[in-house]
């Protein structure tokens, strides 16, 4: 057997020389597959590192300075942001090679280069009112999930999950921001288009809406703006979320103050039973340890002719190894957050983010609802309209509602 000199990375091919061309071809394919997978992980690692650098830009106010000051030098950016000049220049150069920031005078001396943030990038990073605002997706994994990774390791070993509060303020604010654009830009149209009967009834003075697991209240405030004659009540067991919601209400305008209120606690403690025309759970049911009991509590709160509206992740009817990227995202979020949160209470349904339509139908059926699936054409969200089944009695016992995410 004659061995030819080869590149070290192909050294494993040598042992197949005596086995013929087919074996060598198979090994080459295996090597190529490993190489391609390694490159894929490198790309993921690079994206993670660049996301961390974006987190620095948001937390340190660097993007804000770039937008306000315009094309300028690293020294000027550092001065306006009150940061170390050398570290600021390194960040600006990194942002340039990442394609986030532009540079004028690439070949000039470092101190003479002028950096700028393109308007479209500024909108995605800084404009909270834009439906393209993506900054929360930077904050959530870096500021929220990364901090609890050691606890997640333990949670996977014990199966005890991880409470929502453990993820902290960054995760709480990131979640609110990520869905805030949906509530503002899409939810009004969805309700009027797909639920015109409920939309009309909610415009009659005296109508009442309950927003269960309301989080920081952005969905509650959006509902109040949608229906200016309705009373809207947001409820959440997480005290920090309700504090955020009340802060948001305080800055939302005096026209909402008399119609919106927030309660920290169990929705079943609400004294006005059977009074709500619409009970909402937005992006929350899949996180709850006892989803059927939650839906039973919501059913008890409905006025005659009232409905429950769910917004949940838009995922496929069944598992597939090659789903769209949106479902890949939902699985990653489930692994890192939603499933551990849902399993932090026992007993738990352990649903996870990827709650498929048949699972929703099953939970709703057990709670005494008929289900209408509403495909709104959004890559990340789907609506479900639940109406009480005529043959199912209203439950007399209402279980405690778990926290929102």
Q: Where are the predicted features?
A:
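A short glycine-rich, Lys/Arg-flanked "PGG" loop and its adjoining helix->strand segment in the class I
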Residues: 292-304
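Conserved Class I S-adenosyl-L-methionine-dependent methyltransferase catalytic core
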Residues: 27-32, 38-60, 64-65, 80, ...
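C-terminal alpha-helical "lid/dimerization" subdomain adjacent to the S-adenosyl-L-methionine
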Residues: 311-366
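Short acidic, hydrophobic short linear motifs in intrinsically disordered regions
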Residues: 71-79
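Short helix-to-turn junction characteristic of helix-turn-helix DNA-binding domains
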Residues: 66-70, 224
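Long, low-complexity, charged/polar intrinsically disordered regions in eukaryotic proteins
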Residues: 2-43
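Conserved adenosyl
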Residues: 135, 142, 146-286, 291-293
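Core SAM-dependent methyltransferase catalytic element
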Residues: 367-404
């Amino acid at each position: 057997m004659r061995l030819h000199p080869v590149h070290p990375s192909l050294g494993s091919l040598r042992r197949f020389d005596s086995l013929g061309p087919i074996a060598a071809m198979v090994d080459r394919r295996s090597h190529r597959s490993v190489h391609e997978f390694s490159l894929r992980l490198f790309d993921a690692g690079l994206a993670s590192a660049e996301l961390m650098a974006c987190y620095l830009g948001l937390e340190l106010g660097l993007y804000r300075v770039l937008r306000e000051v315009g094309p300028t030098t690293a020294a000027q950016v550092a001065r306006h942001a009150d940061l170390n000049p050398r570290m600021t220049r390194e960040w600006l150069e990194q942002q340039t090679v990442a394609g986030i920031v532009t540079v004028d005078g690439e070949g000039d001396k470092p101190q003479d280069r002028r950096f700028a943030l393109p308007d479209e990038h500024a909108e995605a990073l800084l404009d909270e009112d834009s439906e393209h605002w993506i900054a929360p997706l930077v904050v959530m994994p870096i500021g929220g999930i990364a901090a609890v990774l050691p606890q997640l390791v333990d949670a996977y070993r014990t199966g005890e999950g991880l409470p929502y509060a453990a993820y902290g303020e960054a995760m709480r604010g990131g979640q609110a921001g990520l869905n805030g654009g949906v509530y503002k830009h899409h939810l009004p149209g969805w309700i009027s288009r797909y639920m015109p009967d409920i939309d009309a009834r909610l415009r009659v003075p005296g109508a009442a809406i309950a927003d269960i697991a309301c989080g920081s209240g952005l969905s509650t405030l959006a509902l109040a703006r949608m229906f200016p004659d309705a009373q809207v009540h947001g409820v959440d067991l997480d005290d920090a979320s309700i504090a955020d919601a009340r802060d948001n209400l305080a800055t939302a305008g005096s026209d909402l103050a008399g119609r919106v209120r927030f309660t920290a606690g169990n929705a079943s403690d609400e004294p006005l039973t059977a009074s709500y025309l619409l009970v909402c759970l937005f992006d929350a049911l899949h996180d709850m340890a006892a989803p059927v009991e939650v839906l039973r509590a919501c059913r008890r709160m409905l006025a005659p002719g009232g409905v429950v509206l769910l917004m949940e992740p838009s995922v496929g009817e069944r598992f597939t190894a090659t789903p769209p990227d949106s479902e890949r995202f939902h699985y990653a979020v489930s692994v890192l957050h939603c499933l551990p949160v849902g399993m932090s209470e026992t007993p738990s349904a352990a649903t996870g983010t990827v709650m498929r339509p048949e699972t929703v139908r099953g939970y709703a059926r057990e709670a005494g609802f008929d289900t209408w699936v509403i495909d709104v054409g959004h890559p990340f969200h789907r609506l479900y309209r639940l109406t009480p089944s005529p043959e199912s009695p209203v439950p007399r016992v209402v279980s405690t509602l778990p926290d929102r995410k």
